[in-house]
Amino acid sequence: MGNCKDKDHLPAFTQIDTGPDSPTWLKQAVFYQIYPQSFYDTNGDGIGDILGIIHKLDYLQWLGINAIWINPCFVSPFQDGGYDVMDYYRIAPRYGTNRDLYQLCREAHRRQIKVCLDLVAGHTAIDHPWFKASCQPRRNKYSDRYIWTSSAISEADVPLSFIRGYSERDISYVANCFYFQPALNYGFAKPAACQSWQQPIDAPGPLETRKELMKIMDFWLSHGVDGFRVDMAFSLVKLDPGHKETIKLWQDIVQRIHVLYPKVVLISEWGNPEESIAAGFDIDFMLHFGLEGYTDLMLSEKSFFRRHSDGNIGNFVKLYLEQAAKVQSKGLISVPSANHDVKRPCADGRTVKDLKVIFTFLLTWPGVPFIYYGDEIGMRYIPGLASKEGGYGRTGSRTPMQWDDGPNAGFSMAGKDQLYLPLDPRQNRPTTKKQASDPRSLLNHVRALIALRKRSPALQAVGTLIPLQGENNDRHFAYLRQSGSERFLIVLNPSAQSSQVRITGIKIYNLAPQICHGTQACVEGDNIQIHLDGASYGIFKL
């Protein structure tokens, strides 16, 4: 089956550590992503709110969570679920008030839980007062806050999305995603001489935009927020090959913010850790876009964590190790369970057994784990839902949290037809209440994994990772985690077939099972022989 010393294409990295400016608590961090409109409703309007998050902080503390990321909660027309902001300085009334958010920070901190907000840095809503002012033909303070071409009927030969004929201003604006998300102007990396509308990054307009972004960050940090997940962080400077100027822009922002808030946590939606960590972010995600590899885990037809598949994990491991070697002590990488843009793990026929294997991997892998709300109980991706607030095919991953077997699964006291989205219609849908009392549940499995991770430095964000098995077409995966003298062997078999694993080439002083299912292991001299049933996992302390 191979020796760990022969894995030339799966090289070990000896140590990953957070940089000197990164908060040390990130080494033990387990994040929980909250889609606020679907989490918990306290006022009976069918939409989750900030007070609902406060109400459930004790649950998150019980689970072992020590940081939360809240999707956009600012004033918005909600054409894209809040990723179209109208006012960066005010909480959307449907979620509550600014005072509610300040209270959330205080209550979370009392439970040793950090709070990170979602910062949409690259664009605003089309209804934002800045954009309305920018649309005016007469020049004003906001004329250059967005990117406008020189003529509404010109065909600019550049790879950007132009929206024409929207306003009386005789020019087109650039949109980032949907037409109603006009791109903020941070300048162009190399403005074309023949395109006078392409402003350099140090022009007055782009500099004012940058200053406003820092002002927004300062406002929320001064009220107790611990950091931000930055939406599309790579997209700010336009026509920027390799994102070189965007990296410089973020380096400038991070340096200035750190003067006032040295412990701020910055998480990027970038998908290329080598670039984002260089830009000054503490964490970057392995994503469904960006560098290839993440989809090999759960999302593709031949993903590794699919029971009836011939997928292997080698491509993901190779990519992860390459990126980890490049960022080294400067930052961390996250492999999320899912997010609001992709299918949940509980999709495509996966069962609780399958999900337990997935979480065993996610919570023993280096970097910072992010759990999408409801994944810890195996909430299902609901196919075929009508699009809500620009969700389209993503809508099925945004349904209300399932707390108990009461009305609306304990999410809201509103009428069924008033709920933000329909609930999972299954009679046996999972709930936190049922699973909390079942020691064999997915929820208690996740809780036990988090507890083991927290008390075991070798299983946390930094330290040694040595892949032992999983190359070629293996349907199992084995790896070693180590910190100082503490060592753990993790073995996974997500397939339907049983498997035999033989580990050689490592010193064995002990073989103590920690969290295991369907595994039988024995020591034979300097070797470990492990039998893995289908859909099984094992964590052994060596």
Which residues does each PLM region occupy?
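Loop/helix patches that line or flank the sugar-binding groove of alpha-linked glycan CAZymes
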Residues: 13, 26, 258-260, 280, ...
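Substrate-binding cleft/loops of secretory-pathway carbohydrate-active enzymes
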Residues: 125-135, 270-301, 380-392
